[in-house]
Amino acid sequence: MQMNIGRCGPVCFSCSAPPSKSYTHRALIIAALADGQSEIIGQLDADDTRMTARALMQLGVRLDWSRENIRVQGTGGHLKAPVEEINIQDSGTSMRLLTGVSLLADGPVVLTGSGRMQERPLGPLIDTLNNAGAKITCLKNPGCPPVRIDGTFPAGDMYVDGSISSQFISSLLIAAPYADNDVHIHLTGDPVSLPYIMMTIDSMRAFGAEVLVDGDDKEPVFTISSQRRYKPQTYGIEGDFSSSSYWFALAAICGGSATISGLNPQSAQGDRRLLEILVNMGCSITEKRESIILSRDPDVLLKGIKVDMADCPDIVQTVCMVAAVSSSPTRITGVHHLRMKESDRIAAIANGLTTLGGRVETEEDVIVIHPAPLHGGIIHPENDHRTAMSFAVLGCFIGDVTILDAECVTKSYPGFWEELRRIWQNAVLC
């Protein structure tokens, strides 16, 4: 499927934030480990979250997924070894979070995925668990899926490299209450995406776990009590700042306003920082009780900024689209881990913007975007949902932009194209 995007003028629209993908993943897995039935309300129904649910069912978890909620019959931390390997396809979150959790099964578990998934790193997580006494074997390429997971979840001190993915730490955190004794997780390297770790801890505490945080942002230590295991809960999923970023960016790029409901202004989500970034680029923000409004006068030029985005990688592409129409250069640092996402996102940004006439410089950890006249073109997202959605938003400003393989957005936001079509059609009426 391809989507052809024409130019639209200033926008003026309201929409609801999709449910958080990150919180849905975490709630599903934690509820599956709790002792009793939990209800997850307002979940994200997308490819990735469905993949986590299917994997949990293969691990012996009973769940009932309806449009409004998911009822999960928890196992008390006693998972069943699956008869067949678990193929989580392209869901990196499922792969990483379930690697640690699979050590709670009563036998070996094999996790595999798509061709791209088999290139994505698991090494630091595997090394940490094996050094602590687990038995995890890579079945194809060193440090990558597919993996065979055996043994039990270890207690005591663990040291994990946090410079590649925060999901390695989240994987350890979520399973840790079911170790025989307390677990102490020490981060090494320069940790990235720390807010995602706090989202994990936030979810764990909501289900009754005890997690203590010591140290500082550079060398935090997390202590998880083995005496406070998960209890069943009724748990509501808050709105997703990552997916909402495209609508805020649309108003920033085209001018006008976007009113997004369902977002928590005090959320632990690191991608909430987008609002601060867009204000620094020339937009204004108004927070109301149940909505956040971003606006920009079309006569006021956007300006470039210098920003470190190590803690909010999922909105880097969104910010790059705004930078591409700004009046001065933008320099983004802290992005080295983007090369190991669903695609090499640094290359995707550079190639896509160059195709549309943009001027981009990249290094291992840096993206610099210069002002340049833009024109239409064809974008190949390489099955990366965030590439497709980001360039679609920019396409509304440029016009004559075609997004190939547009169905890839179902990974995180199945309703994206329908929502964009509605906003685009109404833009001329504002």
UniProtKB/Swiss-Prot annotation:
Keyword annotations from UniProtKB, A to Z: Amino-acid biosynthesis, Aromatic amino acid biosynthesis, Cytoplasm, Transferase
Gene Ontology biological process: amino acid biosynthetic process; aromatic amino acid family biosynthetic process; chorismate biosynthetic process
Positions of the catalytic residues: D314 (proton acceptor)
Class of this enzyme: transferase
A single Gene Ontology CC term: cytoplasm
Subunit annotation: Monomer.
Function: Catalyzes the transfer of the enolpyruvyl moiety of phosphoenolpyruvate (PEP) to the 5-hydroxyl of shikimate-3-phosphate (S3P) to produce enolpyruvyl shikimate-3-phosphate and inorganic phosphate.
Name this polypeptide is given: 3-phosphoshikimate 1-carboxyvinyltransferase
Organism: Methanospirillum hungatei JF-1 (strain ATCC 27890 / DSM 864 / NBRC 100397 / JF-1)
